[in-house]
Regions:
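N-terminal cap/lid segment of alpha/beta-hydrolase-fold proteins
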Residues: 1-32
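Glycine-rich phosphate-binding loop signature in dinucleotide/nucleotide-binding domains
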Residues: 31-32, 100-102
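Short beta-strand element of the alpha/beta-hydrolase
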Residues: 34-43
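The serine-hydrolase catalytic nucleophile loop
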Residues: 43-56
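Short glycine-enriched, charge-decorated loop/helix-capping segments at active-site entrances
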Residues: 44, 79-85
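Conserved catalytic-core motifs of eukaryotic protein kinase domains, centered on the activation segment
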Residues: 49-50, 77-81
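Conserved alpha/beta-hydrolase
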Residues: 54-78
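Alpha/beta-hydrolase active-site loop
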Residues: 83-101
Length: 102
């Protein structure tokens, strides 16, 4: 990963869940010093929203790591919003954190 501008970053996709509950989750992660930022979007928001982009830009300027992702049914991730549940979105959050933040 590079310290390119937020708009230049291409998403990486990971698979979360099993069987029919499997979802394709879009993630944008930049390496940097810690502590880093882990963006958890709000209800019906996505990682390309103004707040997420502002935090990513700050992280880039400060040399901090930053991880943003879209929950299933949001932004660049797969799935339909109506199929989303708090449990699914929690599972996605944990999977992204474990893959990109540890």
């Amino acid at each position: 990963m590079t310290n390119s501008a937020a708009s230049d970053q291409e998403p990486v996709f990971i698979e979360v869940g099993e069987g029919d509950g499997r979802r394709r989750i879009a993630v944008r992660a930049r390496e940097g010093a810690g502590p880093g930022l882990f963006w958890l979007g709000g209800f019906n928001s996505d990682m390309k929203g103004t707040k997420a982009l502002a935090l990513d830009a700050w992280a880039a300027e400060q040399g901090r790591a930053c991880v943003r992702f879209d929950y299933s049914g949001h932004g660049e991730s797969g799935g339909a919003f109506v199929d989303g549940t708090i449990g699914r979105w929690l599972e996605e959050s944990v999977a992204v954190f474990e893959r990109f933040c540890l």
